[in-house]
């Protein structure tokens, strides 16, 4: 498995998101090229991608978002998406473990995530990797 940090939005990266986002959610459209370029330029985010071997098509992605707050650096694991054709083959685990490594290297004191309860395999993966249920309310304010 080849994991890499996305630093430029190539046609391959753009097309991967057009294919992968609908596999995650139907609530939002796939990002535009400008959205993805803003993501990789944003200082607080790291976009990772996975392919089976270097140069082969992208089969998974994950985003690490970091915020610096008075209580320290906090990490969030966002939008882990593995292509349906390769689920269950360790791609999600590899991406998540790499995000954990990067969060540690960046000085984060924790890494949080949310996962839809219907995504049973993903929830089992996160628990197997050591994520614990965080007893708090999560609120969202749509802007």
Residue ranges and their predicted role:
Residues 80-82, 115:
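Hydrophobic adenine-recognition pocket in adenosine-nucleotide-binding enzymes
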Residues 87, 112-122, 140-143:
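Conserved beta-strand-loop-alpha-helix junction that forms the acyl-donor binding cleft
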Residues 3-72, 78, 96-98, 133, ...:
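Acetyl-CoA-dependent GNAT
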């Amino acid at each position: 498995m080849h994991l890499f940090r996305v630093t430029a939005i190539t046609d391959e990266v753009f097309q991967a998101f057009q294919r992968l986002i609908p596999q995650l959610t139907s609530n939002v459209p796939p990002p535009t090229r400008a959205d993805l370029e803003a993501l990789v330029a944003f200082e607080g985010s790291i976009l990772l991608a996975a392919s089976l071997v270097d140069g082969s098509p992208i089969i998974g992605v994950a985003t690490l978002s970091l915020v610096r707050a008075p209580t320290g650096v906090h990490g969030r694991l966002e939008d882990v998406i593995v292509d349906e054709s390769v689920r269950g083959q360790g791609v999600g685990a590899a991406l998540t473990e790499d995000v954990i490594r990067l969060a540690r290297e960046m000085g984060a004191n924790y890494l949080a995530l949310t996962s839809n309860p219907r995504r049973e395999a993903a929830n089992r993966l996160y628990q197997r990797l050591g994520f614990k249920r965080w007893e708090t309310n999560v609120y969202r304010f749509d802007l």
